[in-house]
Amino acid sequence: VSGSWNLVCKLFERTLRSTCNQTSSDYQVIVVCHEKPQVSFDTSQVTYLQVNLPLPGADYASKEKDKMLKMQHGLLHAKAINASHVMFVDADDCVSQHLAQFVAQNPNENGWFLGRGFDYQENFRLLRVRHRNLHLRTNTSHVIKLDLLEPEMKLHPDEVKRGDCVLYHIDTAAILKQRGTPLKLLPFRGVIYITDNGENMWWSQQNIASKNNGIQSILAALKSSYQSFITQPVTDSIRDEFGLYPIDAS
């Protein structure tokens, strides 16, 4: 499924450490995977749920389907442990350490979409501030009251696909609003979206498209130059809040 299992494990371990760096202990992490990643970090608040799903193909649609099926498995386990809210986290992103405490302080809310946060370029180790709509760019983007996801838990695997399904992050907030259970904007920056590590599905898809088109390659180079003017280094406070540290891809 991945081009580099070693890199996947390194990225996942950073995400796991970030997710478990909460200021509140009132949380559980459910890792849904085909194969358990090889990491040196462990805690009793992490549960590994290995699933026997068909391996996805190399295309984007197949990978998205695989991700949504894993999310469904995670939902069912979250229900079994009586979770109040759930948040789906991609295996390479980093999240704010204040999320669990904030949710615990607002137990009756439908949930939140993470519209604000950062993009992070691994190769350059730079951040770009995102002031809006970050929840449309990454799957690490919503905290949802578990009861609102009952329809998704009851879907047959063949029905798990983009459409009237909350599990596709681009549609999540809009569908919940249509159902009469809207989410609120999270009132602080909640996620660092890792964009260019090579294991990111959206980024990889765009990179392939650029390499297959000369004009797109030029535009990508211009975009890269522009990025240097709109990015910032990682500060100590951001590093501490999000558990972000450099990854050696070798």
Regions found by a protein language model. Name each.
Residues 35-83:
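Active-site-proximal specificity loops/subdomain of glycosyltransferases
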Residues 81-94:
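Short beta-strand-to-loop acidic/aromatic patch adjacent to the donor-nucleotide binding site
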Residues 1-10, 58-65, 157-165:
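Short, flexible/disordered intra-domain loops and linkers
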Residues 8-26:
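Short, acidic, metal-binding catalytic loop of nucleotide-sugar glycosyltransferases
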Residues 83, 108-110, 181:
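Short, high-confidence coil segments that cap the C-terminus of an alpha-helix
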Residues 157-250:
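C-terminal catalytic/acceptor-binding lobe
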Residues 19, 33-37, 91:
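Conserved short acidic donor-positioning loop in nucleotide-sugar-dependent glycosyltransferases
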